[in-house]
């Protein structure tokens, strides 16, 4: 991987799930900041499948990144959705999928900011995306910008929330991984499947989005 490190000695923390998007963000952060200046925060929020946490742990260790696991599973007691409960994936009348976890990204950003301030870190990186965001309201740029202001005011600290994938399609996210020299790494080691199937089930919305994006990118290279 080409380490450009344009940020000098600045440090960054990546919200990291072990999925395609957050792993691509982690790899980009390593290129931009240097591996010694990057940390990862992973959340146990009551997700149905342990494979997600296992992948995140393995990748962090493989890349030499300090990983901090934060337990926010209390959210499971106050909300229900297909990410935490054994229910069929559906959409409501407005088109919102029941894989949406109310408050999840707000909670992740809050806890990451608390951790970051304690470590003297100002740059927070998250892989949310408004282009292929499945209708999740907390993946929108307007939410991230609002949360950035709120966190700065709440803690009297200058956080900078970076969203390198915000306006990329899934195909462009694969392209970014390729430009980082990590296309095969992301293909082989990340987990995206909502059903927790190793290598992907191929039929859930997340697997379909991932595979369609990959095929679009590979076709564009020919």
Swiss-Prot record:
Gene: queC
Keyword flag Iron-sulfur: no
Pathway(s) annotated for this protein in UniProt: Purine metabolism; 7-cyano-7-deazaguanine biosynthesis
Function comment: Catalyzes the ATP-dependent conversion of 7-carboxy-7-deazaguanine (CDG) to 7-cyano-7-deazaguanine (preQ(0)).
Enzyme class: ligase
Binding site for ATP: 16-26
Cofactor field: Zn(2+)
Swiss-Prot/TrEMBL keywords: ATP-binding, Ligase, Metal-binding, Nucleotide-binding, Queuosine biosynthesis, Zinc
GO biological process, one term: queuosine biosynthetic process
Keyword Protease recorded: no
Family according to the record: Belongs to the QueC family.
InterPro entries: QueC, Rossmann-like_a/b/a_fold
Organism name: Mannheimia succiniciproducens (strain KCTC 0769BP / MBEL55E)
Catalytic activity reported: 7-carboxy-7-deazaguanine + NH4(+) + ATP = 7-cyano-7-deazaguanine + ADP + phosphate + H2O + H(+)
EC number(s) recorded for this UniProt protein: 6.3.4.20
PANTHER family, per database record: 7-CYANO-7-DEAZAGUANINE SYNTHASE
Residues holding Zn(2+): 193, 201, 204, 207
Protein name: 7-cyano-7-deazaguanine synthase
Any one Gene Ontology molecular-function term assigned to this protein's record: ligase activity, forming carbon-nitrogen bonds
Cofactor note: Binds 1 zinc ion per subunit.
């Amino acid at each position: 991987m080409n380490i450009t490190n344009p940020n000098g000695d600045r440090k960054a923390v990546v919200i990291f799930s072990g999925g395609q998007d957050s792993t691509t963000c982690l790899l980009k952060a390593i290129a931009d900041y240097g591996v010694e200046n990057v940390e990862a925060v992973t959340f146990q929020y009551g997700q149905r499948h342990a494979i997600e946490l296992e992948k995140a742990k393995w990748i962090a260790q493989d890349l030499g990144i300090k990983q901090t696991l934060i337990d926010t599973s209390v959210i499971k007691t106050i909300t229900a959705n297909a990410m935490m409960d054994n229910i069929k994936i559906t959409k409501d009348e407005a088109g919102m999928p029941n894989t949406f976890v109310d408050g999840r990204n707000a909670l992740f950003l809050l806890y990451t900011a608390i951790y970051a301030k304690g470590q003297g870190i100002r740059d927070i990186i998250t892989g949310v995306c408004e282009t292929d965001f499945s209708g999740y309201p907390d993946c929108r740029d307007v939410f991230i910008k609002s949360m950035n202001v709120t966190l700065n005011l709440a803690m009297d600290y200058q956080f900078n929330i970076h969203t390198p994938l915000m306006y990329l399609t899934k195909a462009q996210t694969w392209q970014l991984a390729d430009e980082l020299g990590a296309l095969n790494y992301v293909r082989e080691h990340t987990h995206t499947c909502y059903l927790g199937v190793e290598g992907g089930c191929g039929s859930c919305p997340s697997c379909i989005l991932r595979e369609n994006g990959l095929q679009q990118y590979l076709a564009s290279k020919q």
